[in-house]
A protein has these predicted regions:
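Bulky hydrophobic segments
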Residues: 1-100, 106-124
Length: 124
């Protein structure tokens, strides 16, 4: 693995770890915000970043076919990661499964995918 690949890999793993830690801490320990559904906005943001980092890591490997394929794999991995975290929250006594959280996660992934595809097509 090159330094470039390793850098994206480490960033992706660290970001995924932060998401996991924040997702499993007791809900009562989370700061409360009074703005309209701010947690959903955060879900969109953190999963958009996760998708971008995952894409950058996959992009650093020339063995995968096309940028589009790398982008779609990145989105799939990140949506599944978000779903797995929601399932983990289902078994935690202080957390709960929230389908709207998973929807926000998926929207973040898809927004990132859109940005990746638009930016990639303009670079051609």
């Amino acid at each position: 693995m090159t330094i470039h690949q390793r850098t994206w890999h480490v960033l992706m793993i660290l970001w995924a770890a932060v998401i996991m830690v924040v997702s499993v801490i007791p809900g009562a320990d989370l700061p409360s915000l009074s703005i309209w559904e701010p947690d959903k906005v955060m879900h969109v943001f953190v999963y958009a970043v996760m998708t971008f980092l995952t894409f950058q890591w996959f992009k650093s490997f020339s063995s995968l076919d096309s940028l589009n394929k790398k982008a779609f794999i990145s989105v799939t991995v990140c949506i599944l990661y978000g779903f797995i975290i929601e399932l983990i929250q289902l078994i935690l006594p202080t957390r709960s499964f929230d389908l709207l959280d998973e929807l926000a996660n998926s929207i973040g992934c898809l927004l990132s995918l859109t940005g990746i595809l638009v930016f990639s097509s303009k670079r051609k």
